[in-house]
Amino acid sequence: MAVYNYDVVVLGSGPAGEGAAMNAAKAGRKVAVVDNRPLVGGNCTHLGTIPSKALRHSVRQIMQFNTNPMFRQIGEPRWFSFPDVLKSAEKVIAKQVTSRTGYYARNRIDTYFGTASFADEQTVEVVCLNGVVEKLVAKQIVIATGSRPYRPADVDFRHPRIYDSDTILSLGHTPRRLIIYGAGVIGCEYASIFSGLGVLVDLIDNRDQLLSFLDSEISDALSYHLRNNNVLIRHNEEYERIEGVENGVVLHLKSGKKIKADALLWCNGRTGNTDQLGLENIGIAVNSRGQIQVDEHYRTEVSNIYAAGDVIGWPSLASAAADQGRSAAGSIVENGSWRFVDDVPTGIYTIPEISSIGKTERELTQAKVPYEVGKAFFKGMARAQISVEPVGMLKILFHRETLEVLGVHCFGYQASEIVHIGQAIMNQKGEANSIKYFINTTFNYPTMAEAYRVAAFDGLNRLF
């Protein structure tokens, strides 16, 4: 068994692992990264964010072709199979792997591919994919192993018609009807994707409102557009059992309902990838979902071991994970790059997409904050009309007296891009955070960003 010494060893090469490794390497530390796949990128690149967003992009293009009257001069609506659409995602994955492999090489970061486990607080043993065992000794270690779909013991995921959000990418046919159990972010995104391919989707929600952490108006808009695309949303339902049959799946609900479909996609929760790390050897405990508790510096119970990304739970976003990993390494190298990551915009890639940052109306009302609302509807925006993207709106919440921007909520075309302008203003200190910025700033025309100016005028006109 060969022994290699490093300053920092990072377990996982997803967004959190990459962020930690790059920051430590640029600070002059000798760094190694371990991943259990034969390629870098983590779950985000291979099974999560990248393939699902690439799928969504392809489906949006199909939907635009099939609904835009101009294209009727070319031909009738076209329908594509799920495997056909998946091919475009596979091309993006390959490009991402090539790019990220280059990042590690340029920064002289050693990569190991295999299963890592702790021998002690400074030693990690790696069983490489070729069977060779390597021992990595480091002063500091960052756990960034990510998460995987939660699989309850009473659901038979070996059945060929029962999938989770990882295995759905191996779906070799296009089901006529699909049950999606779990109406969180992933469930809603896949409901949009499959309904866009003409699949009849039953979306099972354990709660009484979709994505209740969103502003209520945005959540209601999402519900409307999913239903408008033939997604049947069933609220306040829980499964009794899931029965795999020869030609599909039967979902038995506690309410007494039975639903049959060609396949079932399980999207109800995630579990931290910690069960094979040997954490019991170093005294680190995990919660019931396999997640590790950390302090504000992303340090675990063991002083030289840090954790970041999905493996620590909230907010479980690739964007936040990258910053958490970078901040964890910043705590290690003390180069001033540490910050506690809590100001994170929400990006939900449904069709249409959603993005928000800051407080919702519900939160401000409960806190008795005197706020006002400014709105811009995309159907009136020149750029949206040109792009034939009339669905959506931008909503700004601001303080009636100080004019401070308190929240930005966007639904529709380019929402995840638009939100960052509001985020930049909200991050300004004192009087610099003001809705008047949007009034006193000249925006390019026609653009979607111009919605801020329209919404600001709308909101200020409500004051008296």
Curated annotation (Swiss-Prot):
Family stated for the protein in its record: Belongs to the class-I pyridine nucleotide-disulfide oxidoreductase family.
Pfam entry (one): Pyr_redox_2
Cited function: Conversion of NADPH, generated by peripheral catabolic pathways, to NADH, which can enter the respiratory chain for energy generation.
Keyword annotations: Cytoplasm, FAD, Flavoprotein, NAD, NADP, Oxidoreductase
Positions with a binding annotation for FAD: 35-44
Record's cofactor remark: Binds 1 FAD per subunit.
Gene coding for it: sthA
EC number(s) recorded for this UniProt protein: 1.6.1.1
Name of the featured protein: Soluble pyridine nucleotide transhydrogenase
One annotated GO molecular function: NAD(P)+ transhydrogenase (Si-specific) activity
Keyword NADP listed: yes
Catalysed reaction equations from the record: NAD(+) + NADPH = NADH + NADP(+)
Cofactor(s) the protein needs: FAD
Subcellular location as annotated: Cytoplasm
Any single biological process term in GO: 2-oxoglutarate metabolic process
Presence of the UniProt keyword Transmembrane in the record: no
Listed PANTHER family: DISULFIDE OXIDOREDUCTASE, SOLUBLE PYRIDINE NUCLEOTIDE TRANSHYDROGENASE
InterPro entries associated with the record: Class-I_Pyr_Nuc-Dis_Oxidored, FAD/NAD-bd_sf, FAD/NAD-binding_dom, FAD/NAD-linked_Rdtase_dimer_sf, Pyr_nuc-diS_OxRdtase, Pyr_nucl-diS_OxRdtase_dimer, STH_gammaproteobact
A Gene Ontology term for the protein's cellular component: cytosol
